[in-house]
Amino acid sequence: MNPMTFTVLLATIMSGTSIVLLSSHWFMTWLGFEMNMMAIIPVLMKKYNPRSMEAATKYFLTQATASMILVLAIIINTMYSGQWTIMNMENQLASILITLALVMKLGLAPFHFWVPEVTQGVSLDSGLILLTWQKIAPLSLLYQIYPSLNTNLLLTMSLLSIMIGGWGGLNQTQLRKIMAYSSIAHMGWMIAIMTYNPNLSLLNLIIYITMTSSMFMLLIINSTTSTLSLSLTWNKTPIVTTMMLISLLSLGGLPPLTGFMPKWMIIQELTKNNSLILPTLMSILALLNLFFYMRLAYSTTLTMFPTTNNTKLSWQFKNTNILPTTAPLISISTMILPLTPLLITLN
């Protein structure tokens, strides 16, 4: 793809998300979603092959369906309230429809089927945009309308997402699918706390984007897309592979890494609201995610596969595509757990 075209598309994607973030009118919000969707489809097809075309088509059909449901909900809400203001959600049916539309855009269960397939069909850098930046706009809209959301519906979908995100990743060997199921599980944690403490959900989103971005950047540096190629990276880039191990454990939520912080704060907040069964189930289901992160960590750095002497002398060209943001992102995604008391105080 032409670099100028790619830059224009990225600017359009960011503009669409910014419109959703800044608008208080339903029509402008819908327009921002459509701008975002139409700009990211060529980005998904950056490497032109049948897999990427199939992934872009699946993404388009899912997002278009979600947009139609969103427009229907907006019309119903406007008919009942007589206003186009986002904060004015008076109709319960409109609220449920908007929730379903945004959940479909986010890829939460039971509307999660497109996420692993689309992520697997695109390149690593397109997958990075898909699993990080594309989550901002729907979550920001949920953040704006959280007082009128159906708590039971959100909690059911969040628990289902955490369970499917754990079970789905257990038998995967493709790293992009594993990251997709990881994204589904993390979205479940964010949605669970949305109606209780939306600021905590926002903090969870920031930490999730940081951890996922650092993991994808490390995968891009090593050009690895499967567990087999991941197991051979230690001979080539031991330092990068060690950073990958730490990032994986942080994604799994092991203390004393950053990923433990949002889980800790969400469980604490749910417990404060006299909800004990839900955080217990969420904690148990999170062990499924931790298992396949540990499996990746084990095959990456904790063991050496039987190899011939030739592969132990592997070499590769110096990677010139390392972004300057990689090191700060890795630092943030692994070492800010000591700031938790400060964040609890601010919260």
Curated annotation (Swiss-Prot):
EC code(s) of this entry: 7.1.1.2
GO CC term (a single one): mitochondrial inner membrane
Record-linked InterPro entries: Complex_I_Subunit_2, NADH_DH_su2_C, NADH_UbQ_OxRdtase_chain2, ND/Mrp_TM
Main location: mitochondrion
Enzyme kind, highest EC tier: translocase
Localisation: Mitochondrion inner membrane
Residue ranges that the Swiss-Prot or TrEMBL entry lists as coiled coil: none
Protein's membrane topology: Multi-pass membrane protein
Gene Ontology biological-process annotations: mitochondrial electron transport, NADH to ubiquinone; mitochondrial respiratory chain complex I assembly
Keywords: Electron transport, Membrane, Mitochondrion, Mitochondrion inner membrane, NAD, Respiratory chain, Translocase, Transmembrane, Transmembrane helix, Transport, Ubiquinone
GO molecular function, one term: NADH dehydrogenase (ubiquinone) activity
Positions of transmembrane segments: 3-23, 25-45, 59-79, 96-116, 127-147, 149-169, 178-198, 201-221, 239-259, 274-294, 326-346
Catalytic activity, reaction form: a ubiquinone + NADH + 5 H(+)(in) = a ubiquinol + NAD(+) + 4 H(+)(out)
Subunit annotation: Core subunit of respiratory chain NADH dehydrogenase (Complex I) which is composed of 45 different subunits. Interacts with TMEM242.
Family (UniProt): Belongs to the complex I subunit 2 family.
Role noted for this protein: Core subunit of the mitochondrial membrane respiratory chain NADH dehydrogenase (Complex I) which catalyzes electron transfer from NADH through the respiratory chain, using ubiquinone as an electron acceptor. Essential for the catalytic activity and assembly of complex I.
Protein name: NADH-ubiquinone oxidoreductase chain 2
Source organism of the structure: Sylvisorex ollula
